[in-house]
Amino acid sequence: MKFDVVGIDMPCLDFAVNVDHFPEPNGGERIRELSWQGGGKVATGLVAAARLGARCAVLGAVGSDSYGRFCEKDFIRHGIDTGGLLMREGRSTSLSVVLSNRETMGRAIIYNLGTAEKMTKEELPLEAVKNARYLHLAMLDDVAVEAAKAARQAGVKVF
């Protein structure tokens, strides 16, 4: 299948908490909205593209924990192909708590890195990359470089 956008990411689970303003130290603040959602820079871009009608696929790895399974289901819910999303057995997925401040429109993020190893060059499905119109990257590691080289040779635009 040809995709409009293929993205390589280490997806995480975001717990988004929206408040009117951040509390003072030792203070409190009422939560206005909260949600669980798949996160990561590339993952967020893929969801936005899919909502606009693009055919998208995610390549990467998550843990086999409940957070990783949630991320996979969230991609599927948004119509994003997960055939290239690896589940690392017995490993955990990263978690971010995103605190959004309505008053300043700012945010603060606290996170826990999971133990799931990134996708390796040997695991990278190059055909998915070569058959895309665009390749979306957020990290500059050996997997991203390998994917970018293959994409360029195939005439795929990289961003």
Region spans (language model):
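Glycine-rich phosphate/adenosyl-contacting loop at the front of the ribokinase-like
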Residues: 1-61, 66-70, 77
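Ribokinase/PfkB-type carbohydrate-kinase core domain
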Residues: 1-11, 61, 74-87, 99-159
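Short, glycine-/polar-rich solvent-exposed loops and beta-turns at beta-strand/coil boundaries
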Residues: 89-91
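Short alpha-helix plus adjacent loop in nuclease-associated cores
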Residues: 93-98
